């Protein structure tokens, strides 16, 4: 897949910190899909963090054939199928061997809206990509992209640096931190993040919401070391 000359992928080192840090940092950058029909994508406005000590993380049960991408090199895409009808795309974080990821929940269309509408016909633009399953349908993201290198400009799916990042974070911020959506395990953990002023956030009203300043975060968490049993691939 040819690379776009004006797009600069986020470096692999960007994804090496904890998913809780990367989830905040991704807000304002671009998720871009390259297809034979053209390019589409937009600004990431909502994310969720899943850490290695998190019962809701797909890596919590250990390494399997289905979740092995989670335990691999940071900066790759982890795509899974849910509810028998939707795909979800995540960015893998932390050094190899530690299963953490950021779920990309919503984005604001910037490129190729017409192409996205062909993939997902809707009457309102807001409904095009305001949810993890919706954005995957609009951008034709499925399990074929599981393991895709998000740091390679020639990949069919990348996360690119937004040259207007600082301005956009100020205009759409501050960042709101809330509990995550649609999970039953560790449901009270405040690990969902979104840009408050974006109209493309999936759900804004949550009882534990709090705002944090826009801009680069300095949040740090202790690294999690996967147990020895996770080094063995088991049946999914």
Regions found by a protein language model. Name each.
Residues 2-224, 228-236:
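Conserved, well-structured core segments that form or line functional sites
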């Amino acid at each position: 897949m040819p690379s776009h000359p004006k797009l600069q992928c986020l470096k692999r080192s960007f994804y090496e910190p904890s998913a809780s840090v990367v989830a905040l940092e991704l807000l304002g950058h671009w998720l871009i899909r390259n297809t034979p029909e053209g390019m589409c994508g937009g600004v990431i406005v909502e994310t969720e963090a899943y850490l290695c000590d998190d019962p809701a993380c797909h890596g919590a049960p250990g390494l399997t054939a289905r979740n092995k991408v989670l335990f691999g090199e940071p900066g790759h895409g982890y795509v899974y199928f849910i509810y028998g009808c939707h795909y979800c795309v995540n960015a893998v974080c932390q050094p190899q061997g530690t299963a953490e990821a950021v779920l990309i929940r919503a984005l604001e269309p910037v490129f190729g809206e017409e192409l996205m509408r062909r993939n997902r016909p809707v009457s309102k633009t807001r409904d095009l990509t305001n949810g993890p399953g919706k954005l995957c349908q609009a951008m034709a993201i499925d399990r074929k992209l599981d393991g895709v290198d998000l740091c390679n400009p020639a990949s069919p799916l990348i996360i690119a640096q937004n040259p207007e990042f600082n301005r956009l974070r100020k205009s759409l911020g501050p960042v709101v931190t809330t509990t995550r959506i649609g999970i039953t395990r560790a449901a009270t953990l405040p690990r969902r993040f979104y840009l408050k002023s974006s109209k493309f956030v999936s759900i804004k009203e949550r009882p534990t919401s709090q705002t944090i300043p826009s801009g680069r975060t300095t949040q740090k968490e202790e690294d999690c070391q996967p147990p020895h049993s996770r080094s063995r691939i088991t049946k999914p």
